[in-house]
UniProtKB/Swiss-Prot annotation:
PANTHER family: CARBOHYDRATE DEACETYLASE, YDJC DEACETYLASE FAMILY MEMBER. One of its GO terms (biological process) is carbohydrate metabolic process. It is an enzyme of class 3 (hydrolase). This is Carbohydrate deacetylase. Belongs to the YdjC deacetylase family. The gene is YDJC. Probably catalyzes the deacetylation of acetylated carbohydrates an important step in the degradation of oligosaccharides. Keywords: Carbohydrate metabolism, Hydrolase, Magnesium, Metal-binding. GO terms for molecular function: deacetylase activity; hydrolase activity; magnesium ion binding. Mg(2+) binds at residues 14, 134. The keyword Plastid does not apply. Its cofactor is Mg(2+).
Amino acid sequence: MSRPRMRLVVTADDFGYCPRRDEGIVEAFLAGAVTSVSLLVNGAATESAAELARRHSIPTGLHANLSEGRPVGPARRGASSLLGPEGFFLGKMGFREAVAAGDVDLPQVREELEAQLSCFRELLGRAPTHADGHQHVHVLPGVCQVFAEALQAYGVRFTRLPLERGVGGCTWLEAPARAFACAVERDARAAVGPFSRHGLRWTDAFVGLSTCGRHMSAHRVSGALARVLEGTLAGHTLTAELMAHPGYPSVPPTGGCGEGPDAFSCSWERLHELRVLTAPTLRAQLAQDGVQLCALDDLDSKRPGEEVPCEPTLEPFLEPSLL
């Protein structure tokens, strides 16, 4: 059998958000379309999700959450720079704005991250296979440093670096979505240093900013992976991660992280991703392109002709995305 051109981890985010979401994620995993999940420990269905992960031996990491719902750490007991007046996190953009303004106390971020890592260990009986950030909070300035420190302290080696080659030229993305994707990429580039200094590792490439929700299709996923493979030497195998959000739509009031489910979770877009990921079209295209699905644990040892995921392999993917 010829060596694959790419070994791809397909990660389903937001595991534990609601039972219907989790049902779809498990369905995708059992179909071989998803190879890893990221668990929200403050999600409405966290405990049942952890049971599903154990039952089906699903590789599970932490989806560190600093932007949606209620905290699990000391912040839940009183005033915190992480929370609004109602005791909830500040929201996707609210948290970013607070970080940019210098209003977020980074030691409080560290406390919450450690609490979530501890909660994960209690739920699963082990450390996460990896940790990434809900709404990419883990690469924000300052936050990336304490995130890396916490992961190193808890023995977590793998993270996500959300740098997607060519995302700035993806004209199908609405202007706000494209601007957000490019902002995430700028933060991710700056996070390389802190992540490397604390021994964190990640796949050579990342895809998912351009293929989220309604924008996912077999053609776009394979196109994004093709951009990653451009210029790859013959006989060399790259590693990559595809971020995905499959599942069945949430039905209010069930779901969420303490505030109920958000609009995206209740929309048809989650089901759309599930159908794209599990359809024969995408699987056939990936096989034709020499892409082999795997879990992060499968990348833990170097094979002939490929690199162990780490910072030095990233250099070809660090060029800026153009708006």
